[in-house]
């Protein structure tokens, strides 16, 4: 940079105070001899002497220093928290960086650092702030992309009750508290500032809840789904309250906003149709063209500008457009893969950190002294916020209890509904820029948001039991619903025929319909990217073969036979072996399945005598699913066709072994579905422990089975009941051996007979714990028959 340009630069940046004072609020222009964004290096200062500029005074190096410093610091905080086992969200680490930088460089007497981090806005355009705002909007768009718009329907009235009460009651309490203060004392804060504080505390935006739950890896839990749904309810409620406030002040403005929203709704609908068209024209397994991704980003920022101009809080427009993008592969997942990590790692930290740097930290230090004397901004703010927070926690907690959510989860829900994060920070910054709150109130609210975002995840981590993350509040089993909602897992081509045979035996009908999701699991090897394909949305490219062509064609034929009573949806998941059980459980949870069907890890030759495969990876998968499943699970040991011929009229002889217990009840419920099939001959073999041999106990035991049998008498019912009194496991083994050739399929509960005389002594010889004591005996190579076995475990 030459001396002339350096002189102009310094005069413009450092010596134009008088010119600014003369011009007042009017703008003025000056012309640089040369426009330079980047420096000539550290040697410039040495060559030009006092007339030269340091490299950090140029806009581009300054921006690079800010980005690099904030990135390194927030990553350092994030790794430190993980090492310590403290579950602090990423955005909280970003805000913490801003607080540390402001305190550190504000007190240090190092001009270059002050100039870069504290006073950069005085001498250059707000490029870092603009990039941070860009990232904030993009983050809202991506949150919309990952959102399942049907989540509220799945949560039902629970989320509506919690969402409405957790916003309305704190809002009213905040207004009453302000009114009482206004009458009893002289306030240093304005009514508008109290309104902003009350609104900030009453809101629980979906994006903040989703961000918190995602960072804590509990986003798919039942209470996590309810919390997100409740967040959506508060978003809608806040929208209508805001529009109502505009209408009450100016009816014309309210009408304009209503028309603007209707126009935007039509626009979102058209975008949704366009996105579905993109998916339909993207071949199965192929990536979406980049041009569609760029169009999506452009539309997101246009939506932001539209909402900023005609509605309010522009990021909501980007979020609403994100909802129009079908979540999951192939389109939604690509948006996340391409933009989320880069945005969250590089650009979003600028928003979180620079927002905290804007706070007046010297004022905060001063106010700590005034707070002890019970007056001033800090006293008013920090005596107001906890009261509204307690009101919000209490209403959320009580509403959760009222909707029959367990006590511990109700407490966690109350904590989640009080979380504060990026939305609240963006909202108070917007209020400050529009002169609705002062810098002092902004500083106090910023500190509260930081402290809240630090303590909330710690409280959740302390209260939450991660081993129960797949547990559902409602019972998901076959006894609760007449409709079978089954998730069939296909690991190998051999599983296709066996699973179709089993589904055929369950006899889907108009009175007892079946909704079946078929999940083809393919193990990823090497460094390939996990992929999830919905075969309802994507079709193979003409001339190419699908990953799951055999699976698709086979189950399509099954659906054609049962077209009026069975609904089949097919999916393919390419993921690593160690994550397959997580994929199955999450998918079953999201689809509302009440039965997961898995294949046993061993396969036999057609005669059922020689083992040809013993897949220990599949066995590990089955064990993990049994431990974590959100619904009932069935493991199918397929040793020979359960239908003797391929003709539809061929009979299938099924034996249900019933001892008692929850697993046997679930097996009985599954057998009830099979009774509707005219080709199924069902026998209930009741093994009665000698402890039940007295008349009263036997009568109670019999009623447990007879209740199911007589509840729904069907024409042509071919089911029978056979009773045996058993003294020990040896007698049980003899009975089962005696009937081994009489049946094609045995159904038994996994924990059937455990702790009773029926299985005494048999447990010592058990080889496969996933089959239970009796199931292991039936599947043993020493069992004379080669009948297939279905082992059922009820949801725990």
From Swiss-Prot:
InterPro entries in the record: Cation/H_exchanger_TM, CPA2_transporter, Na+/solute_symporter_sf
Regions that span the bilayer: 54-74, 93-113, 131-151, 159-179, 194-213, 223-243, 259-279, 285-305, 310-330, 344-364, 382-402, 411-431, 444-464
Entries under Gene3D superfamilies matching the protein: 1.20.1530.20
Tissue expression summary: Preferentially expressed in pollen.
Any single GO BP term: potassium ion transport
Recorded GO CC terms: membrane
Alphabetically ordered keywords of this record: Antiport, Ion transport, Membrane, Potassium, Potassium transport, Transmembrane, Transmembrane helix, Transport
Name assigned to this protein: Cation/H(+) antiporter 6B
Organism whose genome encodes this protein: Arabidopsis thaliana (Mouse-ear cress)
Record gene name: CHX6b
